């Protein structure tokens, strides 16, 4: 019973379609055993919605076996008929085979079956994977209801799946997305209202679509009206999620009536519709109607005929007329419209009077497109406009700015071509017409995803400021572009302050009180291969052109909107997906609502709209009118057309100071003590505003971690977080710099024009090349600063020039000559950078100690040509703009220009011959800029786009090449259905696919099979109904030609067959007839394979779909080649090339394989070893060698051996070219099946002297891989040359003798030197020994005996006693008198005395010595003192 229960459980697990080892998506456990409401059956597939009957579940339980055992036993004892006996034998055999069969490790799902031979699942058409758990093909669904799913678990990488739901023509079908989780902006599910991708697109789902509530009203739902629906899913190779579970039904009310009504059949048609509950209206009962009876009779009245319900009395507003006028709290409302021309995204809107003008935008289908829309904010109705408003081509991602009843539209992406434009057009509201402006100075970037504002500067100029955006040629733009409305000119502003990073899809607002722009978020690239969303907030002051970094929001997003209400910037919606390798739950579409307090630099999160409807979106527009924000359109997988209205809290609704101060968040109110009124931020006085700022400053909390984010001095000191710069890093102001570092706390003190700071802000090669101080590093795809010493010591790189200021006192001509000595010339200060640098350097030099006593008025390269014309040394005219003449200048006496005091920025005219202090020299920078590759946007073919590197991506259906860091910015609404990189390009159209399987992998293709019954056909653009004819011309203007059904391209009457869901069973590629509908009878035309899809050995080509095979072209050096490419597998080592037409010259092989072969050149007297053991060597069966004798009077010996048998042929020729080209080789040796061979070739027999270029050829062939071969040629003499011997012998002997003499002499010198050193050390040692004097008494015979002391009469004593080590022995020295002559006089020449020494034993005499010493002490008083002496 336990086993049976386990079997039943395993069967049930297979029916569920997943096992416990398979990761189930979020939410499965809650739904996995939910009973089916309609049938009471069990639901084993939660995502699929499949219900199994109760009968089936009972059948899966094991039957009772005990009552049947006796019956079974009796049946076994009965004799079996022959047929039954044979069946039993067959069953036994099959049982034995089943015992040997392999079982699949995991159960097969989705209709797959386990193959007992391989132990692997065999999947039905459309399913792939080890368990058939992933979709991977096309499906056709015909039921009146059903489900669409990618399979259990996470979907597969690089997946393409297509579902065709076929119903009845023009019958309404509803698709309900119960679960959907894919990678945002990269993995899409497209829904078409028809039977092909050429039908109208109605949705492009991506990201995490999770209902905001548990109710049914927020789950996405798509309505299809044609009776057909095509769903196509594509995923890339980044990361995958749990996929989707979609149910469809032809008889279902919208959103199941949102749970607030009943679904009933319509009386007038066969459709169904909702009968809403009380207080609910709308097609799906999702609109509140007359809540709280509109507060009747005090606040309003219910209008049953109006979908809006309440008609509020004066002084009341909001849902149910529950909020007074002015509003004491904020609230949301929603207006829904069904006009097909309204849905759009990435449009722009402005308000003029009571009219909201909406211009441009992206739409799925352009049949009902209107370029300009007008919305009456008072009546909440859309207005009708003239058809002339559509005279401009469709675009999106542009900018709008309003000025005096004129709407200025700039940039954007042209939808029909995919190009980004730099057009500036003006829409005149009064006559509803467009005018194209042609600026005088065209120095602007073509951008998309930017913003623009028209402002009046303090100088009175009216300009349009274009902020950031993405340019396909220059990447993400970080500059501010200015258009002067009066001068009709463009310019790029040189801003100051923080170095900000521009991006795509940010929001920006202009605050009239602070005269500043506030820019938030966006999609940004921080290098060519690093990009992400941003949460930055920047402030740009329009008069000072100063950027300041404010507190970031910590909410990353792009394609959101912002407006300013009473000193508060309100931010709504956007795309918040910021995951790159795995999902962290960030959603594509957001309804986040945030507020930024301008005065306090503080963010707060506001409640999301509570509208009983999903309002998540991005790419919408937002405008402000009478403190009310209007949000229109956007994208949330579907294009939206509703209007969200947010009415903010009003300051004047608060009557007390406490309530006024506590107002918000979302509004900033100030209490006016004089009038005792609560006023908004815009109406506050300067004193009130400053007081508020000071209060906020005292309460603010600093985020010290933000300081670490700044990598340059400018951004570190131009922010609101109190940071300061310490040499090379930014730290909080309460952290001191370390010793030796300089602290910079103010922006003005930062070193200006440091290229290390701003080069890394450039994200493309072209933008990097615009600045001569930067260079592009192609390996790391980043912009880096040029080295500081590129100009040399003392020179400074400024732009593309090197400048140097000297202090020498000289006249103009000498200064010019001094510059020329450095290959320079006097500077032409024609750019702002040069002027600023020179003036700054002069100020620094003037303040330094070394030059403080000098008054520097340096010469510059400015001269007077005639009476009224001055020009620079580079011949450019002087314009008196960057530098200006001082008052009363130029004087008539001067013809040369000098700089006056640096603070004045002025010029003076001086006499050219007068010597003055200083000169400014200039020379070109001596570096060459690296050439940039062709920008991705200018590459028009896939091969060109993806060939060089991974920096570009090719979108196949859009036929566009984009930067890899701009894919999301280029296709924000899923326009790209499939992309390619790194040399992987598809055919340009369907006709390029040669097999049906490859054809049906493309969602827009179908297969037309010819009548030959061989599987031959053609791939054509088409739908389920048949082929379609593509338009012959591209879209022009706002006219988009659509493909039309053309069945004549595949006529069924002519026995052609159109396949759109599955391929025909016969797939023999036109090389064989099919038997049993699918088996190729005999592959002909040199083909082989299950479907005759490859060429036979020795032939190559593409035999698919009737293709031909041709012989391998290998020039006789190979018999096999790659069956697809034709690349030959050369059999001779040293021969290479696609057709074996080249020799490996780089490896010492030479020859001509077109007329002969290749040979390895051997050196004489060297042994060579060739090991052919690599996988690339498996086709080699031959190798050839060539050798030429070095000596003409010696024989040539050779030997060769190998690890395997081989054939050997040796020939010779009079020269190498003769042997390879004319065939004049003479055979010498021919051996077969040998392993070793030796031979000698006589110089006399082969006449080496008369054939100086004689060459021997060795042909080794017929061996097998792997093999090791050794070969050598050598020349040795038979008789030794005696003369040479003796010459060599004596030369060696004399050389050795000379070496020995030199060594002996060196040794003697070393010995003598060492001996001298030793003697010197001995003398020093002897001189350092202790010494003393001794008295000697010489007795003579005439001396009276009494004159000699008694002590001398004792035993003679030694003059020295030198103890040895251990005091056992000593050296005793005494005076000895030598024999004397007559008179006691020694002989002449002699002293008569000698010193005698002897080694004596003192071990036994030491006590006596000590005794004598003690006796001497006792006798000191008895005897007079005497000198120590010795008696001889």
UniProtKB/Swiss-Prot annotation:
The keyword Ubl conjugation does not apply. Residues 87-1282 are extracellular. Heavily glycosylated. The chain crosses the membrane at residues 1283-1303. Residues 1-23 form the signal peptide. It comes from Rattus norvegicus. One of its GO terms (cellular component) is plasma membrane. Residues 100-133, 249-286 form the EGF-like domain. Disulfide bonds join 104-114, 108-121, 123-132, 135-161, 253-263, 257-274, 276-285, 819-921, 1066-1074, 1068-1080, 1083-1092, 1095-1109, 1112-1121, 1114-1128, 1130-1140, 1143-1158. The keyword Chloroplast does not apply. PANTHER family: ATTRACTIN, LEUCINE-ZIPPER-LIKE TRANSCRIPTIONAL REGULATOR 1. Residues 798-922 form the C-type lectin domain. Monomer and homotrimer. CDD domains: CUB, EGF_Lam. Kelch repeats lie at residues 355-405, 406-454, 464-511, 516-567, 569-627, 628-674. This is Attractin. Involved in the initial immune cell clustering during inflammatory response and may regulate chemotactic activity of chemokines. May play a role in melanocortin signaling pathways that regulate energy homeostasis and hair color. Low-affinity receptor for agouti. Has a critical role in normal myelination in the central nervous system. Residues 1304-1432 are cytoplasmic.
């Amino acid at each position: 019973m336990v086993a049976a229960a386990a079997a039943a459980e395993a069967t049930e697990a297979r029916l569920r379609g997943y096992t416990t080892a398979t990761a189930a998506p979020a939410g499965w456990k809650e739904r996995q055993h939910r009973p089916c409401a309609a049938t009471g059956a069990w639901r084993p597939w939660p995502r699929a919605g499949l219900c199994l009957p109760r009968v089936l579940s009972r059948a899966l339980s094991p039957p009772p076996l005990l009552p049947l055992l006796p019956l079974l036993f009796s049946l076994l004892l009965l004799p079996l008929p022959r047929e039954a006996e044979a069946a039993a034998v067959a069953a036994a055999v099959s049982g034995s085979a089943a015992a040997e069969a392999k079982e699949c490790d995991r159960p097969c799902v989705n209709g797959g079956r386990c193959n007992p031979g391989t132990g692997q699942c065999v999947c039905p058409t459309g399913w792939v994977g080890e368990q058939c758990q992933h979709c991977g093909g096309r499906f056709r669904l015909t039921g009146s209801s059903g489900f669409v799913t990618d399979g259990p678990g996470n979907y597969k990488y690089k997946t393409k799946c297509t579902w065709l739901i076929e119903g009845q023509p023009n019958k309404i079908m509803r698709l309900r997305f119960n679960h959907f989780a894919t990678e945002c902006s990269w993995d899409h599910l497209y829904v078409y209202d028809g039977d092909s991708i050429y039908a109208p697109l109605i949705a492009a789902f991506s990201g995490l679509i999770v209902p905001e509530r548990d109710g049914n009203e927020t789950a996405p739902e798509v309505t299809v009206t044609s009776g057909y629906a095509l769903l196509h899913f594509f995923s890339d190779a980044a990361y995958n999620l749990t996929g989707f579970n979609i149910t469809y039904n032809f008889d279902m009310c919208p959103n199941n009536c949102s749970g607030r009504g009943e679904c009933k059949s319509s009386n007038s048609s066969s459709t169904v519709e909702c009968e809403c509950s009380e207080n609910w209206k709308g097609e799906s009962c999702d609109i509140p109607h007359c809540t709280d009876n509109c507060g009747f009779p005090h606040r309003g009245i219910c209008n049953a005929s109006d979908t809006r319900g309440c008609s509020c009395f004066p002084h009341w507003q909001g849902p149910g007329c529950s909020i007074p006028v002015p509003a004491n709290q904020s609230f949301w409302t929603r207006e829904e419209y069904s006009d097909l021309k309204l849905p759009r995204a990435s449009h722009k809107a402005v308000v003029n009077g009571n009219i909201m003008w909406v211009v441009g935008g992206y739409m799925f289908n352009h049949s009902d497109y209107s370029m300009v829309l007008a919305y009456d904010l008072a009546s909440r109705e859309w207005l009708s406009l003239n058809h002339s408003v559509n005279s401009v081509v469709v675009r999106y991602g542009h900018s709008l700015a309003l000025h005096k009843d004129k709407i200025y539209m700039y940039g954007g992406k042209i939808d029909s071509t995919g190009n980004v434009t730099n057009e500036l057009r003006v829409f005149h509201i009064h006559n509803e017409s467009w005018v194209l402006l042609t600026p005088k100075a065209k120095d602007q970037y073509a951008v998309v995803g930017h913003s623009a504002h028209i402002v009046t500067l303090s100088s009175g100029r009216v300009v349009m400021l274009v902020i950031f955006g993405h340019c396909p040629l220059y990447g993400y733009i970080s500059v501010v572009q200015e258009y002067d409305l009066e001068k009709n000119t463009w310019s790029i502003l040189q801003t100051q302050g923080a170095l900000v990073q521009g991006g795509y899809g940010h929001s920006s607002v202009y605050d009239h009180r602070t005269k500043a722009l506030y820019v938030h978020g966006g999609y940004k690239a921080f290098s060519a291969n690093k990009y992400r969303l941003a949460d930055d907030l920047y402030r740009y002051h329009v008069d000072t052109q100063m950027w300041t970094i404010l507190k970031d929001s910590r909410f990353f997003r792009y394609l959101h909107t912002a407006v300013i209400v009473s000193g508060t910037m309100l931010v709504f919606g956007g795309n918040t997906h910021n995951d790159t390798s795995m999902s962290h739950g960030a959603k594509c579409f957001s309804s986040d609502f945030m507020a930024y307090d301008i005065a306090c630099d503080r963010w707060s999160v506001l409640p999301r709209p509570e509208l009983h409807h999903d309002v998540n979106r991005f790419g919408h527009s937002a405008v402000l009118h009478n403190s009310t924000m209007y949000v229109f359109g956007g994208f949330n997988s579907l294009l939206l057309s509703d209007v969200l209205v947010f009415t903010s809290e009003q300051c004047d609704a608060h009557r007390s100071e406490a309530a006024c101060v506590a107002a918000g968040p979302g509004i900033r109110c100030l209490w006016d003590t004089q009038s005792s009124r609560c006023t908004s931020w815009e109406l506050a006085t300067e004193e009130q505003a400053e007081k508020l700022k000071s209060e906020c400053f005292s309460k603010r909390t600093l985020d010290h971690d933000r300081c670490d984010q700044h990598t340059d001095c400018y951004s570190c000191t131009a922010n609101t977080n109190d940071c300061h710069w310490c040499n090379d890093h930014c730290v909080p102001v309460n952290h001191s710099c370390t010793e030796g570092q300089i602290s910079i706390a103010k922006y003005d003190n930062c070193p200006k024009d440091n290229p290390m700071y701003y080069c890394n802000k450039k994200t493309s090669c072209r933008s990097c090349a615009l600045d001569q101080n930067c260079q592009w590093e192609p390996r790391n795809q980043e912009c880096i600063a040029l080295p500081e010493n590129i100009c040399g010591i003392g020179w400074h790189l400024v732009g593309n020039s090197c400048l140097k200021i000297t202090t020498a006192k000289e006249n103009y001509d000498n200064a010019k000559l001094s510059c020329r000595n450095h290959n320079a010339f006097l500077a032409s200060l024609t750019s702002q950078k040069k002027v600023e640098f020179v003036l700054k350097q002069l100020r620094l030099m003037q303040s330094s100690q070394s030059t403080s006593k000098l008054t520097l008025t340096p010469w510059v390269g400015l001269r007077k040509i005639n009476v009224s014309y001055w020009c620079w040394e580079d011949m450019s005219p002087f314009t008196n703009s960057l530098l200006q003449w001082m008052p009363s200048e130029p004087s008539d006496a001067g013809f040369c220009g000098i700089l006056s005091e640096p603070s004045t920025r002025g010029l003076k005219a001086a006499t050219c011959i007068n010597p003055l202090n200083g000169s400014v020299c200039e020379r070109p920078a001596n570096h060459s800029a690296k050439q940039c590759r062709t920008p991705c946007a200018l590459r028009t073919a896939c091969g060109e786009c993806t060939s060089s590197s991974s920096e570009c991506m090719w979108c196949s259906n859009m036929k566009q090449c984009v930067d890899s860091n701009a894919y999301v910015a280029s296709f924000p609404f899923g326009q790209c259905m499939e992309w390619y990189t790194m040399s992987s390009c598809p055919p340009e159209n369907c006709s390029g696919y040669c097999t049906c399987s490859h054809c049906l992998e493309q969602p827009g293709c179908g297969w037309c099979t010819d009548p030959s019954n061989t599987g031959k056909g053609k791939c054509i653009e088409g739908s389920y109904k048949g082929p379609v004819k593509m338009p012959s011309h591209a879209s022009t203007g706002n006219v988009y030609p659509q493909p039309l059904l053309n069945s004549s391209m595949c006529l069924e009457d002519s026995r052609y067959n159109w396949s759109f869901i599955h391929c025909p069973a016969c797939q023999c590629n036109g090389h064989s007839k099919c038997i049993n509908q699918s088996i190729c009878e005999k592959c002909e035309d040199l083909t082989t394979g299950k479907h005759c899809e490859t060429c036979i050995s020795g032939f190559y080509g593409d035999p698919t779909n009737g293709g031909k095979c041709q012989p391998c072209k290998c020039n006789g050096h190979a018999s096999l080649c790659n069956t697809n490419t034709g690349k030959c597998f050369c059999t001779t080592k040293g021969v290479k090339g696609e057709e074996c037409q080249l020799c490996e010259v780089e490896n010492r092989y030479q020859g001509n394989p077109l007329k002969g072969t290749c040979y390895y050149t051997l050196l004489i007297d060297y042994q060579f070893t060739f090991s052919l053991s690599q996988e690339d060597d498996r086709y080699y069966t031959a190798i050839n060698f060539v050798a030429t004798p070095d000596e003409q009077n010696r024989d040539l010996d050779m030997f060769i051996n190998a690890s395997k048998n081989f054939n050997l042929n040796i020939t010779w020729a009079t020269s190498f070219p003769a042997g390879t080209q004319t065939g004049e080789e003479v055979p010498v040796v021919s051996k077969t099946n040998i392993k070793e061979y030796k031979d000698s070739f006589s110089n006399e027999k082969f006449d080496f002297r008369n054939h100086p270029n004689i060459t021997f050829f060795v042909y080794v062939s017929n061996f097998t891989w792997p093999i090791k071969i050794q070969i050598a040629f050598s020349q040795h003499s038979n008789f030794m040359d005696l003369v040479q011997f003796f010459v060599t012998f004596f030369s060696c002997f004399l050389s050795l003798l000379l070496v020995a003499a030199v060594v002996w002499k060196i040794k003697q010198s070393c010995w003598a030197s060492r001996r001298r050193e030793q003697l010197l050390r001995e003398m020093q040692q002897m001189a350092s020994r202790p010494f003393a004097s001794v008295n000697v008494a010489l007795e003579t015979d005439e001396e009276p005996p009494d004159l000699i002391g008694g002590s001398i009469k004792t035993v003679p004593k030694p003059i020295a006693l030198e103890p040895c080590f251990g005091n056992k022995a000593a050296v005793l020295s005494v005076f000895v008198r030598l024999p004397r002559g007559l008179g006691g006089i020694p002989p002449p020449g002699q002293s008569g005395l000698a010193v005698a020494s002897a080694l004596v034993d003192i071990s036994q005499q030491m006590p006596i010595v000590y005794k004598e010493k003690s006796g001497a002490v006792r006798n000191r008083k008895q005897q007079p003192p005497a000198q120590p002496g010795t008696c001889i």
